[in-house]
Amino acid sequence: MTSPRKTHPLAKIINESFVDLPTPSNISSWWNFGSLLGTCLIIQITTGLFLAMHYTPDTATAFSSVAHITRDVNYGWMIRYLHANGASMFFICLFLHVGRGLYYGSFLFLKTWNIGTILLLATMATAFMGYVLPWGQMSFWGATVITNLLSAIPYIGSDLVQWIWGGFSVDKATLTRFFTFHFILPFIIAALATIHLLFLHETGSSNPSGITSEPDKVPFHPYYTTKDILGLTFLLLALTSLTLFTPDLLTDPDNYTLANPLNTPPHIKPEWYFLFAYAILRSIPNKLGGVLALAMSILVLMIIPMTHMSKQQSMAFRPITQIMFWTLVADLLTLTWIGGQPVEHPFIAIGQTASIMYFLIIITLIPLSALIENKLLKW
């Protein structure tokens, strides 16, 4: 008799995705981040649900409700810090996952890659709106500065900003709608992640060598379920260590001050995972130009498949492109550092140089190095 695991309509879907899924036998730990991102999403939804039970999305009580969660709710401090630091872990996994996709040529699976880019944008939007909810100084001013960027859109800009605000400034209406969207978006992300997985399983995973793995596949379970548990252990160890020992390591001290529209903080900056994009935004003196550069810093991922000039899928055997890739990683770290610095000399010049390098490497230097490598292969 055939196992119900293979015949039951619901069990069959799970079985084909996580148990009997044919998986390349040589994929490394870099392929672990998909399951880690799924874990992060589950952690975020669970902790977020418990936080929403005690949080009040009102300008008069939001800040004190977060203080109440931290002080009075049983393990409220832990739920809150798991949620806040869980977001950091989520973005670390996201960046590593995207980096793996770039390095090993996973962007050639167009549908999977484009859904992944949409997932990244949706996650960034969710994190931004979540940062506004505690209603501290950085919450308020971050929301004001970032939403105000839309006023750079010609003709409809200022109307659009007021429509998003629900008034003439960031206020009660803004906080309420941000809470609404912050609550609903993770479920949309979960749905998009399912579609992401669906498209991935149409083609199957790539592998480090970049050549077809059709002749050599193994079932996902027990091989990769066991392997993924190791990565999961490290993720949970890092998250719990951060939460229990240094919960405020990645947060801004300004956010422990109640939002005050009459007092601007000296340095308005977002959470660390947005600093690279924020640095690109600030490096352009023109407002509209900055907004376009900010959007392109993420949307450029969608044009990467079109700039793929190499005869090989993976970068594993392409030393010139590898140099370009690691230069891009160093450039992103530089941008992250610059995003947290004040707008003054020499940070302005470093930020502008790093921003130019970011787009130059992705759009020009990586395709160029691929063409050189193609030429060298003929020799």
From Swiss-Prot:
Ranges that cross the membrane: 33-53, 77-98, 113-133, 178-198, 226-246, 288-308, 320-340, 347-367
Any one GO BP annotation for this protein: mitochondrial electron transport, ubiquinol to cytochrome c
Keywords of the record: Electron transport, Heme, Iron, Membrane, Metal-binding, Mitochondrion, Mitochondrion inner membrane, Respiratory chain, Transmembrane, Transmembrane helix, Transport, Ubiquinone
Cofactor: heme b
GO cellular component: mitochondrial inner membrane; respiratory chain complex III
Binding annotation for a ubiquinone: H201
Binding annotation for heme b b566: H97, H196
Main localization of the protein described in the UniProt heading: mitochondrion
Subcellular compartments: Mitochondrion inner membrane
Classification via Pfam families: Cytochrom_B_C (PF00032), Cytochrome_B (PF00033)
Top-level taxon: Eukaryota
Binding positions for heme b b562 per the UniProt entry: H83, H182
GO molecular function: metal ion binding; ubiquinol-cytochrome-c reductase activity
Alphabetical list of CDD domains matching this protein: cytochrome_b_C, Cytochrome_b_N
Membrane topology: Multi-pass membrane protein
Free-text comment on the cofactor: Binds 2 heme b groups non-covalently.
Subunit note: The cytochrome bc1 complex contains 11 subunits: 3 respiratory subunits (MT-CYB, CYC1 and UQCRFS1), 2 core proteins (UQCRC1 and UQCRC2) and 6 low-molecular weight proteins (UQCRH/QCR6, UQCRB/QCR7, UQCRQ/QCR8, UQCR10/QCR9, UQCR11/QCR10 and a cleavage product of UQCRFS1). This cytochrome bc1 complex then forms a dimer.
UniProt record similarity statement: Belongs to the cytochrome b family.
Record function comment: Component of the ubiquinol-cytochrome c reductase complex (complex III or cytochrome b-c1 complex) that is part of the mitochondrial respiratory chain. The b-c1 complex mediates electron transfer from ubiquinol to cytochrome c. Contributes to the generation of a proton gradient across the mitochondrial membrane that is then used for ATP synthesis.
Note: Heme 1 (or BL or b562) is low-potential and absorbs at about 562 nm, and heme 2 (or BH or b566) is high-potential and absorbs at about 566 nm.
Protein name as it appears in the record: Cytochrome b
Species per Swiss-Prot/TrEMBL record: Callithrix jacchus (White-tufted-ear marmoset)
Gene name, Swiss-Prot/TrEMBL: MT-CYB
